[in-house]
A protein has these predicted regions:
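Compositionally biased Ser/Thr/Gly- and acidic/asparagine-rich
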Residues: 1-179
């Protein structure tokens, strides 16, 4: 008798989105977002993962209680997928054209994903198109770029601002960092 591991009606327990940064056809970096019940917008040990290279081309940050660590994996409560803004860190040299695209989009219908560039005042609807930029100056740190997950279709005409300041102190340092 053969067995089948498929269980009818077994609910999906998490959703995933992977963003990738490319220069031309070359993939440079990716960052992952997971949404699962029981997680928070802060650090969830065993789920959130800091990037081994804090100067990597593409990182995200915690939405709550950010302590200045760039993440390769950012895991959040499943309900957050309906309305959350996540700081994104892009580290690129001036004059180097790059694009950010959605690679994996394992998220239920109706969720819209936008990349905000608050310096240029743009909202790129990543469900429909890639974000492309040739920076005039080197990019680094947080505060300019954000990923928006929402159930609404946003317009670049809307006055959306995510001017955030992050302040944190690492345990082994004698100073506070403000970004």
């Amino acid at each position: 008798e053969g067995g089948d591991d498929f269980i009818a009606g077994n609910p999906v327990t998490y959703f995933e989105l992977v963003l990738k940064l490319y220069e031309g056809a070359t993939e440079i970096e990716d960052t992952k977002f997971y949404f699962k019940n029981g997680l928070s917008l802060g650090l969830d040990p065993g789920y959130d993962a800091g990037h081994y290279n804090q100067s990597a081309a593409l990182l995200s940050r915690l939405v709550a209680e950010d302590q200045g660590v760039g993440l390769a994996v950012n895991a959040m409560e499943i309900e957050s997928i309906n309305d959350v803004v996540i700081p994104l860190e892009i580290n690129r040299e001036a004059g180097e054209t790059f694009r950010i695209t959605v690679d994996t989009f394992d998220i239920f219908g109706g969720v819209q994903v936008y990349l905000e560039d608050n310096q240029n005042g743009t909202m790129t609807h990543l469900n429909l198109e890639d974000f492309v930029l040739t920076p005039e100056i080197a990019l680094g740190g947080v505060g300019r770029f954000f990923i928006h997950f929402t159930q609404s279709v946003l317009s670049t005409q809307e006055n959306m601002s995510t001017s955030h300041l992050n302040a944190y102190k690492l345990n082994n340092q004698n100073f506070i960092t403000i970004e």
